Amino acid sequence: MATLLRSKLSNVATSVSNKSQAKMSGMFARMGFQAATDEEAVGFAHCDDLDFEHRQGLQMDILKAEGEPCGDEGAEAPVEGDIHYQRGSGAPLPPSGSKDQVGGGGEFGGHDKPKITAWEAGWNVTNAIQGMFVLGLPYAILHGGYLGLFLIIFAAVVCCYTGKILIACLYEENEDGEVVRVRDSYVAIANACCAPRFPTLGGRVVNVAQIIELVMTCILYVVVSGNLMYNSFPGLPVSQKSWSIIATAVLLPCAFLKNLKAVSKFSLLCTLAHFVINILVIAYCLSRARDWAWEKVKFYIDVKKFPISIGIIVFSYTSQIFLPSLEGNMQQPSEFHCMMNWTHIAACVLKGLFALVAYLTWADETKEVITDNLPGSIRAVVNIFLVAKALLSYPLPFFAAVEVLEKSLFQEGSRAFFPACYSGDGRLKSWGLTLRCALVVFTLLMAIYVPHFALLMGLTGSLTGAGLCFLLPSLFHLRLLWRKLLWHQVFFDVAIFVIGGICSVSGFVHSLEGLIEAYRTNAED
């Protein structure tokens, strides 16, 4: 009897030891300690299988314990971390069917939020990358020539690729090998990359970049409104700064916005109006096709001003900020890649044609905003439509910037820097309204003192556009999915990071130099 008892105890101990070793080996294998030989790789695969069986057995034991009323009532409940495979941050992954649960939280809203089709998602991306900032692309061709045209194509390819890899960073494989969505935003991806040492550093960096880009976008809308109105009515005794003040007075009610329902009704009309404007400009350019100056398109570049063109082109493609939210709200997320391909192909073709045709028409006389080159009668009509579009587009980035600021700095809790902007009944507090008004006034002051559309666009594209579209997505992709990437994917990510970094620094420096030079010229005048 004693021999039988010792034999059973020995078998149990051996089984427990083997399972523990298998579990630890499986965890080490998944953490990145790759095998050096084929035999070791097979061994790790067996360890993974044993690890899976071990966890499945634990889960079955728990289910049996819950279903048996006469079991050990005093037994201690298992810790959740023991029955869920933990990776990276230490938090258990959601179950395989929890994609909607992850997508339904965070910035996506609740489950009752209606999903959008691939066509609607493509329309949103088109609105972002086919906006009125294409008006500065002919100015980029002025300083870049044929290389500027190549960059329009290259930027489309790279931004499409980085958008896809950014979405790939939202997903991971669970213990069953199923790909599930474990993150819901750009900030969540950044925090995951900086965990565990600095779990919030990445999110703060992304938030700062988002705020800068959104606020600069608002400033550009005010700048272009003042510029267009001033050039539309040069006979009126109203300066560009005065037109900017008038535009800001119209925009001041944006401070009272609680949601974008009222503004969203005009988005389709604004987009259609913009396409009509582009068609009018291209039609006028085609009417002067016999005078096109093909010899003016250069194969060489202006070394000092070409980096500004890079920033302008990159800024016209920025859409990465809202791609995680957009993909999370799609009815068929599997169609995201196809949607990105077609939207960026269309944007590349339309931008390239618009920039080339406009530059061929006016050559060296091309201005920062191409509509300023149109004859007076046509320019006034087109510019009024563009000003209306700019004013109606302003609330979108403004509201997004306010939301980022409120979530980052003005939330109730111990981590918040300031108290919440809203009272308990959901009403906006007076000082919160004051801060919103101050943000509108800040965009006005920047537009007054730096009224240079193309230079500001190049500065923003070099500073935050390249960071959010090139640098961070490639860096996050390498950090989170390193073990699963093929060699050519690693090469693409590293190349994009290096090239993007060089273009970002050079573009920022030269845009800043251009602004300083323009400011000195205005001061002398």
UniProtKB/Swiss-Prot annotation:
Result for mutant: V263A: In GEFSP12; uncertain significance
Modified residues (3'-nitrotyrosine): Y186
Annotated consequence of substituting V263M: In DEE114; uncertain significance
Record's signal peptide: none
Catalytic reaction equation(s): 4-aminobutanoate(out) + n H(+)(in) = 4-aminobutanoate(in) + n H(+)(out); glycine(out) + n H(+)(in) = glycine(in) + n H(+)(out); beta-alanine(out) + n H(+)(in) = beta-alanine(in) + n H(+)(out)
Ranges of the Cytoplasmic topological domain: 1-132, 226-265, 327-341, 405-438, 483-489
Listed transmembrane segments: 133-153, 205-225, 266-286, 306-326, 342-362, 384-404, 439-459, 462-482, 490-510
One GO CC annotation: inhibitory synapse
Effect listed in the UniProt record for changing G465S: In GEFSP12; uncertain significance
Transmembrane recorded as keyword: yes
Membrane topology annotation: Multi-pass membrane protein
Annotated effect of mutating T464R: In GEFSP12; uncertain significance
Lumenal, vesicle compartment segments: 154-204, 287-305, 363-383, 460-461, 511-525
Annotated spans, Disordered: 83-107
Keyword vocabulary terms for this entry: Cell projection, Cytoplasmic vesicle, Disease variant, Epilepsy, Intellectual disability, Membrane, Neurotransmitter transport, Nitration, Synapse, Transmembrane, Transmembrane helix, Transport
GO biological process, one term: gamma-aminobutyric acid transport
Mutagenesis or variant effect for F322C: In DEE114; uncertain significance
This protein's record includes keyword Hydrolase: no
Tissue specificity as recorded in UniProt: Retina. Expressed throughout the horizontal cells or more specifically at the terminals.
Location relative to the cell: Cytoplasmic vesicle membrane; Presynapse
Phenotype upon changing L468P: In GEFSP12; likely pathogenic
Entry-linked Pfam families: Aa_trans
Family indicated by similarity: Belongs to the amino acid/polyamine transporter 2 family.
Disease: Generalized epilepsy with febrile seizures plus 12: An autosomal dominant neurologic disorder with variable expressivity and incomplete penetrance. Affected individuals have variable types of seizures, most often febrile seizures, sometimes combined with non-febrile focal or generalized seizures. Rarely, afebrile tonic-clonic seizures have been observed. Developmental and epileptic encephalopathy 114: A form of epileptic encephalopathy, a heterogeneous group of early-onset epilepsies characterized by refractory seizures, neurodevelopmental impairment, and poor prognosis. Development is normal prior to seizure onset, after which cognitive and motor delays become apparent. DEE114 is an autosomal dominant form characterized by moderate-to-severe intellectual disability, onset of epilepsy within the first 18 months of life, and a choreiform, dystonic or dyskinetic movement disorder.
Protein name per Swiss-Prot or TrEMBL: Vesicular inhibitory amino acid transporter
Organism: Homo sapiens (Human)
